[in-house]
A protein has these predicted regions:
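Long, low-complexity intrinsically disordered segments
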Residues: 241-254
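Signature of dsDNA virion morphogenesis modules
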Residues: 1-244
Length: 273
């Protein structure tokens, strides 16, 4: 259902409340492709340390490991949706059939990594660690993928090896969605608004619009390398995070606070000595 955003706010809010069930049903009906996250990936070396983001792998190797940031939370996207931290927890615990694909194509030849070659988990970053001016945090959906030259997709092996992959996007199904409206006349929706609004990074944009949809649970189907994305968040392209693959239920690795790229690198090096 198309939302008539040109209506005066009070009429728009009335429309949203009246059609709430249908709007949310539409959002949950089919697999959604989120706005792409423009970050690229971290190559991971044999010691489990990440290199500079998007750095080409110059060695003649048959296998590489990359860390791809697939999705982030606490940001209203082009669908008026805000992914809430924790939305992936149930899915990551229960669903072991997750793929790292090329451009959301669910085909054998498009598979980049799966099974034992893919470790999906969540990790909390500050927005400053991702090169943004905002205070606060975002919980990222992260894929650690082992990609083989002789695997299903040698083309994407070479794209990652040459540092050409700049964008990723998650393919998912929404499970739980709440509507938030900034108007006390809509009791339940106003309560949802007050619960989440202060954690939204682009808060001013959301306040100007007056409503959003809080996605509190979603099922991960796949994460894809995509050629071009519409997400306008572009994090810093330098980091030195140590790879510690999660055991059991995916948990959030420890985070550190960044002021500059040099400071974060030095802090993390000290942390992992």
């Amino acid at each position: 259902m198309e939302i008539p955003k040109s209506l005066p706010k009070k009429e728009l809010f009335t429309f949203l409340e009246k059609n709430l069930n249908r709007i949310i049903a539409d959002k949950k009906a089919n697999m959604k492709k989120a706005d792409a996250f423009s970050f690229g990936f971290f190559p991971v070396d044999k010691e489990g340390l990440t290199e500079k983001a998007n750095k080409p792998v110059t060695e003649d190797v048959d296998e590489i490991t990359v860390r791809a940031i697939i999705n982030t939370t606490n940001l209203m996207d082009s669908h008026d949706d805000v992914h809430i931290p924790g939305l992936w927890n149930k899915s990551l615990k229960e669903n072991k059939d997750i793929w790292h694909d090329q451009e959301h194509k669910h085909e054998f030849a498009s598979t980049i990594a799966e099974g034992k070659g893919l470790k999906p988990y969540v990790k909390t970053y500050t927005w400053k660690e991702l090169g943004q001016k905002w205070e606060g945090e975002t919980q990222a959906l992260v894929f650690d993928s082992t990609i083989s030259k002789d695997g299903n997709n040698p083309f994407m092996f070479n794209q990652y090896k040459q540092g050409r992959v700049k964008n990723h996007s998650v393919g998912m199904n929404y499970v739980k969605v709440e509507m938030a409206i900034n108007d006390k006349d809509y009791k339940d929706e106003f309560k949802t608004w007050n619960k989440y609004i202060d954690q939204v990074a682009n808060k001013e944009q959301v306040e100007e619009q007056g409503y959003f949809f809080a996605v509190t649970e979603a099922k991960v189907i796949e994460g894809s390398a995509v050629k071009r994305g519409s997400n306008w968040v572009t994090p810093t392209e330098d980091n030195n995070l140590k790879s510690e693959p999660p055991e059991g239920t995916p948990q959030e690795p420890e985070k550190s606070t960044q002021l500059t790229s040099d400071e974060i690198i030095n802090t993390i090096k000290k942390h992992f000595k």
